[in-house]
Structure formats: structure tokens, C-alpha cells
Curated annotation (Swiss-Prot):
It comes from Oryza sativa subsp. japonica. InterPro entries: Kinase-like_dom_sf, Prot_kinase_dom, WNK_Ser-Thr_kinase. It holds the Pfam family Pkinase. Coiled coil: none annotated. ATP binds at residues 136-139. GO terms for molecular function: ATP binding; protein serine kinase activity; protein serine/threonine kinase activity. PROSITE patterns: PROTEIN_KINASE_DOM (PS50011). The gene is WNK5. Keywords: ATP-binding, Kinase, Nucleotide-binding, Serine/threonine-protein kinase, Transferase. Residues 55-314 form the Protein kinase domain. Residues 1-48 are annotated as: Disordered. This is Probable serine/threonine-protein kinase WNK5. Residues 39-48 have a biased composition (Acidic residues).
Length: 327
């Protein structure tokens, strides 16, 4: 459940502005901030981090199951960031295990450096408020699901570029030492910068770090995107390939997999019996359909992310010629 939409908490210190420590109309010599010109309104921060580098604005970028994400600003680099804020006390009362999963996400983000995985900047704990804060890279256009809903007419070429970038991020996770299984890959956990088309994987709160056997045992995820073996509690990183196939299906159709099901129970029965989503039958492009079917096949037949990157499906995606449009 997302947190209650209560007004954002003010910092215990005085509200700070982007030009903190600099008088209006003056420039800090050798500093990191420049004031707005006289007569311009400055946007106030709701709070700043302990170092004074990062500021949080009031507007919310997104609500997750365990956190609220605000628009933030890095005064040192002059870039916008995502300020992730989690109320640990309320979270611990509702689900103590979630606290550890959140800490796991932070630890993972700190160890991962890849152009197609959301970047991490800083983390700190506000003990008085019982809030964990962490600063991450922000993607200007939100999740891939939101972006696809806003832009209904997208070329197959563009879709392939997005799909390939997701695979590059997955390959980095799966070849990480130790291997990392995302376990909750879906289009709401993939983010995009619309002005560049760059795609990044985020929300690693349910990810699992596994040993050399590459086997995990916990049932977690989003039902519409969960591989059947996830329900058996014994699985490998190939569950991410299944979820990836469902992501591609959603990108193509703009429809959640198994939208025809009325409940999680119905989804479970369809998935475990090998019944594909109804949306798959509506894909007319045989190449697209075959690619998705390859991803959501039996675990032993699913290719790795590295193998999929070599699939003919991605041949020529950097060519200038468009290859058709999805409406």
C-alpha cells in the first residue's frame, strides 16, 4: 500500500533555498550556488540533506509500496535528482521484512554502476523522524508504462531500442558477482528520459543476491509479470527474462499481461498452467511475437540476457530507416 498522502514534513532546520548563504543578486565566489536575479521568485526547499548539498521540493514524482519519491536538486552539480523518503517506523509496524528489503535496495544501488540502471548518490537516516532518505538519479519522463501511455504511436525501431537497453541492464545484474536477480521487473520499474530515449532499470527493493548456484527461494514480485517457477520457491535469474518478455508485451500492446483475469488467483492459475496472456494473440508481427514467446517459455529454454542481445530481433536497430509504427 502506498503511504498516506500527508503533507510533506518540514525540516527541523530553517527552510533553505537553492541560493542558501548567498544574498539575492550576488554570486558566491568559488561556491556552488548562484542567486536568482532581483524580482524572480525562488523555489523553496522543504528540507536539505545534512551536508546541504541536496534539497527536496514539495512536488511528488511517484508513490511506491515502501517509499515516496520527491523532486530534488543537487546544488553542487546543478542537476535534478530523485529524493526517496521512507518512514521506517510505519513500515516496520506494517511489515518488518520490508525494512530489510529497503536497506538491501540501498546497498545494491551503492554497488551498481551502469548506464541502464538508476544511479545512486547518497543515503542517510533521520533518526528523530524515523525516516530513511536516499538520493538517486531521476529520469525526466517517469516510468516506461507512463511514457508509453502518453505516447501511443511509437515505431517498432524505438521499441526495440528500449527493449535492448533493458537487456543491457539485466545482463549487468545477472553477470554481477554475485549474481543479482531483480524479481520485480515490470514497466513501472523501468524509467526513461524522453528527450534522449535512454532507459534505466530501477526499484531494486525485491532483488536477490544469489551464490554461484544462481538459485533463490523466496516468492516475491508482481503477479502479472511473475514466472511460473517463482511460485515453486526455486528459481534462477531466468525469472527476470520471463518478466522482461512480459514487459515487451506491455510495451507493444499498452496492456497489462493477463488483463483478462479478474483476480490474482486467476492469474496464478493461468501462469502455472502455461496459458499465455490474451494480449499475445493480438500481436500481428510474427517477429515480435516469436521474440516474446522465446522469453516466456519454459525455464530450461529461456535464453540469457546476453543471448537475447545477440538475437536477430535487434539487428539494424541503429539504422535510420523506421521499421513500422505501433498504434
Amino acid at each position: 500500500m502506498p503511504p498516506n498522502p500527508t503533507p510533506p514534513r518540514r525540516a527541523t532546520t530553517t527552510t533553505t533555498r537553492a541560493t542558501s548563504g548567498v544574498r539575492r543578486g550576488e554570486e558566491e565566489q568559488g561556491g556552488m550556488a548562484v542567486s536568482a536575479s532581483a524580482g524572480e521568485e525562488e523555489e523553496a526547499f522543504e528540507e536539505v540533506d545534512p551536508t546541504g548539498r541536496f534539497g527536496r521540493y514539495a512536488d511528488v514524482l511517484g508513490l511506491g509500496s515502501v517509499k515516496k519519491v520527491y523532486r530534488g536538486f543537487d546544488q553542487e552539480e546543478g542537476i535534478e535528482v530523485a529524493w526517496n523518503r521512507v518512514r521506517l517506523r510505519a513500515l516496520a509496524d506494517r511489515d518488518p521484512a520490508m525494512v530489510e528489503r529497503l536497506h538491501a535496495e540501498v546497498r545494491l544501488l551503492r554497488s551498481l554502476h551502469h548506464e541502464h540502471i538508476i544511479g545512486f548518490h547518497k543515503v542517510w537516516l533521520d533518526r528523530d523522524a524515523g525516516v530513511l532518505n536516499f538520493i538517486t538519479e531521476v529520469c525526466t519522463s517517469g516510468s516506461l508504462r507512463e511514457y508509453r501511455d502518453r505516447h501511443r504511436h511509437v515505431s517498432v525501431k524505438a521499441l526495440k531500442k528500449w527493449a535492448r537497453q533493458i537487456l543491457l541492464g539485466l545482463d549487468h545484474l545477472h553477470t554481477h558477482d554475485p549474481c543479482i536477480i531483480h524479481r520485480d521487473l515490470n514497466c513501472s520499474n523501468v524509467f526513461i528520459n524522453g528527450n534522449t530515449g535512454q532507459v534505466k532499470i530501477g526499484d531494486l527493493g525485491l532483488a536477490a543476491i544469489v551464490d554461484k548456484t544462481h538459485v533463490a527461494h523466496t516468492i516475491l514480485g508482481t503477479p502479472e509479470f511473475m514466472a511460473p517457477e517463482l511460485y515453486t520457491e526455486t528459481y534462477t535469474e531466468s525469472v527476470d527474462i520471463y518478466s522482461y518478455g512480459m514487459c515487451v508485451l506491455e510495451m507493444v500492446t499498452r496492456e497489462m499481461p493477463y488483463a483478462e483475469c479478474d483476480s490474482v488467483v486467476q492469474i496464478y492459475h493461468s501462469v502455472t498452467r502455461g496459458v499465455p496472456p490474451a494480449a499475445l494473440k493480438r500481436i500481428r508481427d510474427p517477429e515480435l511475437r516469436a521474440f516474446i514467446e522465446r522469453c516466456i517459455g519454459q525455464p530450461r529454454n529461456r535464453p540469457s540476457a546476453a543471448e537475447l542481445l545477440r538475437d536477430p530481433f535487434f539487428a539494424g536497430i541503429d539504422d535510420d530507416d523506421s521499421t513500422g509504427t505501433l498504434g
